[in-house]
C-alpha cells in the first residue's frame, strides 16, 4: 500500500502499516482502530454527538467501558452503587456512562461489577488488549497497552466520537525512538524507577514527536506488569506512544484471558504476534541508552516528572540547572513544594502515602509493597496511607493471598478499585501543603488536590516511606 514503510521496519512501522487505511499527500493518514476503551469522563459528549447525528457505533464489540476516574474508593460509598456517590458531578458522570452503555448496547463493567477497575488495568486483565492491536481511549495514559506490542495512545473527546462512529482515526505518523536499557537492575530497583530515570534523563519533552520503543536486556527481563508501568509513563516523557516488543512473556500473559482468542484462532494469532518486533537492521531516528546497573530508586522532588533524583541525592541547587528556563522552573518548584535547594530527601516530612493508579496498582505492585510493610507499622506522623487496587479482580486476588491483612495490620487503608488519589476528581484528595509519596504518574501543581505536593515513587519506596514517615532507601530498609 502507498505510504507503508519500505525495507527494514521498526515495531512501530509494522503496527502502523498493518492498520493504515489510506494516506493523503499532506501526510495525514486514516488508521483503523481495533480496541476502544471508554470511561465516564471523556465519553459523555461523544455519546451525545452520536445521538444528535442519529448514528450507532460502527463495531460494537470493539468498545468496552468501565467507570474509574470519579468512582469513590471507600467501602461506605461503594456499597450503595451509583446512588451512594456523594459528589453530584461524579455521580452524574458515572450514571451517564451507565445510561449511554445501555442505550448503545456497549459492554460495561459497572461500579459494583467484580471486573470494574481502572481502564488500563482492566483491558489487559480481561484480554481485551492483545498484541498487534491499535488501542485508544480518552485518557493520556493509554500508552500503557503498548507493553503488549500494541500501538496505543490517548485521544480527545471529539476523537472518541469519531472512533465510535467510524472505527478509524486521522493521524500523522511519528518518528521512531529507541530507549535501550542495558545490563541488569540492582536490588530494590523497579520498573517505576527505570521510567522515572528515563524521564529524568531525556526530560518531559524528550519524546515529543516520537513513538518510543523500550528495548534492551532490562526490558527483556522485566515482567509484563513492569512493562505496563514503563509504557504508562511514555506520555510523561513527551511521547503519545510507548511500546515493548512481543516475546514469550507477552503471549503467556495473554493466554487464557477471557477475551483472548481460543483454539485455531489462538494459533493463528500467536504466529502473527511472533513477528511483532523491530527488524534487526531497522533504523531509529533517535536512540537513547541507559545502563540498568546505574539506576537507583527514584524520588521526584518538584512539580514535573523530570524533576526526579536518585534517593541517595539531595534536592538540586540552582547552580546545577542547565539554563535560565530550568532555573526559573526549579525556583517555582522550590516554592510550591516548600523545599530548599540542597535539602536531603529524608528531611521531607510526609503526610500521606498513596499506592495505586494505572501506573502501579496491579498485583505485582501490591505484593512489592506488602513485602516491605509486613510486620511493621505506619509511622504515627503519617495522616493516611492507602492501598487502592487497580480492579476488583486485583483486589480479590490480593485478598486471597492475605495481602489486605498485611496492610490493615500495619495501619493502611484497604480501598475499593478506582483512580483514587492519582487526580483530584473524586473524594480522595490532598489538602493544601500536604506532602504525599505517590505511585501515580504526575506531580503537577494541584494534581492530587489544591496545594497538594506530590512525590512520585515506586510501590516499594512508598511503602517504606509510610513506615518511616519520610523517604528512605528501600535497598537498606
Swiss-Prot record:
GO MF annotations, alphabetized: 3-isopropylmalate dehydratase activity; 4 iron, 4 sulfur cluster binding; metal ion binding
Catalytic activity: (2R,3S)-3-isopropylmalate = (2S)-2-isopropylmalate
Details of cofactor binding: Binds 1 [4Fe-4S] cluster per subunit.
Gene3D superfamilies: Aconitase, domain 3
CDD domains: IPMI (cd01583)
Cofactor(s) this protein requires: [4Fe-4S] cluster
Alphabetic keyword roster: 4Fe-4S, Amino-acid biosynthesis, Branched-chain amino acid biosynthesis, Iron, Iron-sulfur, Leucine biosynthesis, Lyase, Metal-binding
InterPro entries: 3-IsopropMal_deHydase_lsu, Acnase/IPM_dHydase_lsu_aba_1/3, Acoase/IPM_deHydtase_lsu_aba, Aconitase_4Fe-4S_BS, Aconitase_4Fe-4S_dom, IPM_dehydratase_rel_enz, IPMI_cat
The organism's place on the tree of life at top rank: Bacteria
Assigned EC number: 4.2.1.33
SUPFAM superfamilies listed in its UniProt record: Aconitase iron-sulfur domain
Pathway named in the protein's UniProt entry: Amino-acid biosynthesis; L-leucine biosynthesis; L-leucine from 3-methyl-2-oxobutanoate: step 2/4
GO BP terms: L-leucine biosynthetic process
Enzyme category, top tier: lyase
Binding site for [4Fe-4S] cluster: 358, 419, 422
Keyword hit for rRNA-binding: no
Keyword check for Metal-binding: yes
PANTHER family the UniProt entry points to: 3-ISOPROPYLMALATE DEHYDRATASE, HOMOACONITASE, MITOCHONDRIAL-RELATED
Subunit relationships: Heterodimer of LeuC and LeuD.
Similarity comment: Belongs to the aconitase/IPM isomerase family. LeuC type 1 subfamily.
Purpose of the protein: Catalyzes the isomerization between 2-isopropylmalate and 3-isopropylmalate, via the formation of 2-isopropylmaleate.
Protein name: 3-isopropylmalate dehydratase large subunit
Lineage: Bacteria, Pseudomonadati, Pseudomonadota, Gammaproteobacteria, Moraxellales
